[in-house]
Every structure is written in structure tokens, then in C-alpha cells.
Swiss-Prot record:
This is Regulatory protein E2. Transmembrane segments: none annotated. It comes from Human papillomavirus type 55. Plays a role in the initiation of viral DNA replication. A dimer of E2 interacts with a dimer of E1 in order to improve specificity of E1 DNA binding activity. Once the complex recognizes and binds DNA at specific sites, the E2 dimer is removed from DNA. E2 also regulates viral transcription through binding to the E2RE response element (5'-ACCNNNNNNGGT-3') present in multiple copies in the regulatory regions of the viral genome. Activates or represses transcription depending on E2RE's position with regards to proximal promoter elements including the TATA-box. Residues 295-378 are annotated as: DNA-binding domain. The gene is E2. The lineage of its organism: Viruses, Monodnaviria, Shotokuvirae, Cossaviricota, Papovaviricetes. Residues 250-259 have a biased composition (Polar residues).
Length: 378
């Protein structure tokens, strides 16, 4: 047991040094996965010997350490092939080479420089989902890596490799999941892309509302594939009425019918829907600031293994700067699919917490929030 504990301490110390170094060198990240692989081997052997704890660390079940070890081997071998490619000398962060990123859509590819894309389903501002469009995607093709660029159109997020367009997010499938109709709007920065269903619905509404002399006119709408930098719904003329909502009050000008329809740019303002309402969730009135009997806490968030190593180091080197540290935990009722775990630290008072934050250097992959715990600790 002492031999395993000694080797485990050395392994976790190396992991902490790699986290704190936050290198952009791919060889460092290969070393990181080698350490995780070795750690899993030690924990697997300890469990086979009947050990449930090594120091303060709980020894996981055999299947857990075995599965995580296999994942570490996969990541190590994949990164080694990437190192030998044309892109091995590019800057790579620890987040770029994490397993979470590896399994993020598009799966089994490395990604860089993501941009948030908002999709509004059913033209409802309260039904918005966020996705990530990647600028660069590294695809493994047989025996080599290929670097391609990501694109966006009304159908979804995709990349082109070998003349084949591969969608890794399909907005129509997402609309069936999150919406009640096959209508959606894609917002990228200041540009808006609309689904064909949204455009046809808009054309029909405007034609009915127009004068009788224009109902038989032909309607032309052009939809272009878009890049994040340019508006993508264009046409010969522009119409002010919004595509998804009817005016709430009577219109004063009935002589402005148009023969063609375009989807409005996100910078345009609809005068009939320009009211601003206060956000009741942001109101601080009546807030109870009576924290005099509450316990100051810091909640750490990050990779479970990183948090375990950090907690071990805190107990070893900074145990006078906090009172207690929880085990790693997660919210069980959360709707998110985040793999991050949490660790809660408690303090005697705010001064001790402030001293902790000013003294302890947290790894770049760990974030924190400060707060209070109203329950008394036993």
C-alpha cells in the first residue's frame, strides 16, 4: 500500500504541475494523458488488493478505473498521431485536447475557435437554443489529419471534406425536438438565417394582408447560404413587417404593400414591438443581506480529476487557509450535459476566504464562485 501511495502522489503532483503550466505544447498534453493512464493503473491495482482508500482519496470501482484508463489510452494515441501530422506544431491548449472536446459535436474531431450560434424555434424569443460553430475542425482521414473550416446555413452546422458536406448539427431535427413547427431563425452575430418554412409562412401572411390589386403578383424570395460575417436572407426589395408576428394595433398606412419579401436584418427595429419591460428577476428590492451568521464558501468547478488533485494539494500546502473541503459532487437535477464536477470549500470568515483567493493559485481549467452557506457545519 505504501508503494502505491507513493507512486500515486508523484503522479498527481505531475498532473498538478501540468495544469498550472497551462502549456500550448502538444507534447505536454500527451504527457498529461500518460499520467492519467498511470493513475488509473495504480487505482485499479489498489482495488484489486482490496483497498478502498489511499490516504484521503477514495479508490473507485474496477470498472471505473478500467474505463477511464481505456479512454486515456485512446486520447494519448490519438494525440501522438496528431503530433506527427502537419498540425503538431500548432498551439494546442489543455481544453483543445480534453476528452470533452473530443466528444463534442462533431465527435472524434479536434476543434478550435468556437462561435456561439443562437437558434430561435417557432419564432419564439423564449425558445432559443445555443450551439457552437467551429472555425477550424481537424478530421482524421485514414492515415492523416485534415484541417477544414466550419460553415453555417439554414439547415445546420457543417464542414466540407473531400467534396462531401457533413452536418454535425441539423436544425430540422432540433426543431422537431424543441419546437412545435418547422420554423426557426439562426442568429450569428448581426446576421439572421431563416428556415424555408419561416419564409413561406411570412410570404403567405403578407400576401393576405396586402391590397387586392397585389394578391396576384408573383412573389420572389432568395435564400443564400451564409457565413457568420454576412447577412444571408436577401431579396429584391425589403419589407418592414416582422416575419413572425402580426402588428398588435391597427396600421395607419395601408398603401405600402410590396411584391417581394425579404427577411429583416437583425439590426432593424420593429416599431410595433419596441417596448422595454423591466426584468423582475434582476430586481434587488427586498433582498435579504443578512449573512452575519452564514458560512463563507468558495465553489470550485472543473474536471473531476483536476479537482481531486487540487484538493489534495490544498490539504498538503494550504490547510490553514480554509476550514473544510467537500468531496467532488454534481447537480443531479441539472438539464446540462456538462462533465464538470464541483468542490465546496468553507471558511471561518470572509477575511480567511479573501486570503485564500489571494494566496492560492488555481489551475486555469478551474473556475470558482464565492457565496455563503446558511446551514451550520457540524
Amino acid at each position: 500500500m505504501e508503494t502505491i501511495a507513493k507512486h500515486l502522489d508523484v503522479c498527481q503532483e505531475q498532473l498538478l504541475e501540468l495544469y498550472e503550466e497551462n502549456s500550448n505544447n502538444l507534447t505536454k498534453h500527451i504527457q498529461h494523458w500518460k499520467c492519467i493512464r498511470y493513475e488509473c493503473v495504480l487505482l485499479h491495482k489498489a482495488k484489486q488488493m482490496g483497498l478502498n482508500h489511499i490516504g484521503m482519496q477514495v479508490v473507485p470501482a474496477l470498472t471505473v478505473s478500467q474505463t477511464k484508463g481505456h479512454q486515456a489510452i485512446e486520447m494519448q494515441m490519438t494525440l501522438e498521431t496528431l503530433l506527427n501530422s502537419d498540425y503538431g506544431m500548432e498551439p494546442w491548449t489543455l481544453q483543445d485536447t480534453s476528452r470533452e472536446m473530443w466528444l463534442t459535436a462533431p465527435k472524434y474531431c479536434f476543434k478550435k475557435q468556437g462561435q456561439t450560434v443562437e437558434v430561435k424555434y417557432d419564432c419564439n424569443a423564449d425558445n432559443i437554443m445555443e450551439y457552437v460553430s467551429w472555425k477550424y475542425i481537424y478530421v482524421h482521414d485514414t492515415d492523416k489529419w485534415v484541417k477544414v473550416t466550419g460553415h453555417i446555413d439554414y439547415k445546420g452546422l457543417y464542414y466540407v471534406h473531400g467534396g462531401h458536406k457533413t452536418y454535425y448539427t441539423n436544425f430540422e431535427k432540433e426543431a422537431k425536438k424543441y419546437g412545435n413547427s418547422l420554423q426557426w431563425e439562426v442568429c450569428i452575430g448581426s446576421s439572421v438565417i431563416c428556415s424555408p418554412a419561416s419564409i413561406s409562412s411570412t410570404v403567405q401572411d403578407v400576401s393576405i394582408a396586402g391590397p387586392a390589386s397585389h394578391t396576384s403578383s408573383s412573389t420572389t424570395t432568395t435564400l443564400a447560404q451564409a457565413s457568420p460575417a454576412l447577412p444571408t436572407c436577401t431579396s429584391e426589395e425589403r419589407v418592414d413587417p416582422p416575419p413572425c408576428k402580426r402588428p398588435r394595433g391597427p396600421t395607419t398606412n395601408t398603401n405600402n404593400a410590396r411584391d417581394t419579401v425579404s427577411v429583416r436584418h437583425s439590426d432593424s427595429v420593429d416599431s410595433t414591438n419596441n417596448n422595454i419591460y423591466p426584468n423582475s428577476y434582476n430586481s434587488n428590492k427586498g433582498r435579504d443581506n443578512n449573512f452575519c451568521t452564514a458560512t463563507p464558501v468558495v465553489q470550485l468547478q472543473g474536471d473531476p480529476n483536476c479537482l481531486k488533485c487540487l484538493r489534495y494539494r490544498l490539504h498538503a500546502k494550504h490547510k490553514t487557509l480554509f476550514v473544510a473541503a467537500s468531496s467532488t459532487w454534481r447537480w443531479t437535477c441539472s438539464d446540462t450535459s456538462s462533465k464538470h464536477a464541483l468542490v465546496t470549500l468553507t471558511y471561518v470568515n470572509e477575511e480567511q476566504r479573501e486570503q485564500f483567493l489571494n494566496t492560492v493559485r488555481l489551475p486555469p481549467t478551474v473556475t470558482y464562485k464565492v457565496g455563503y452557506m446558511s446551514l451550520q457545519l457540524l
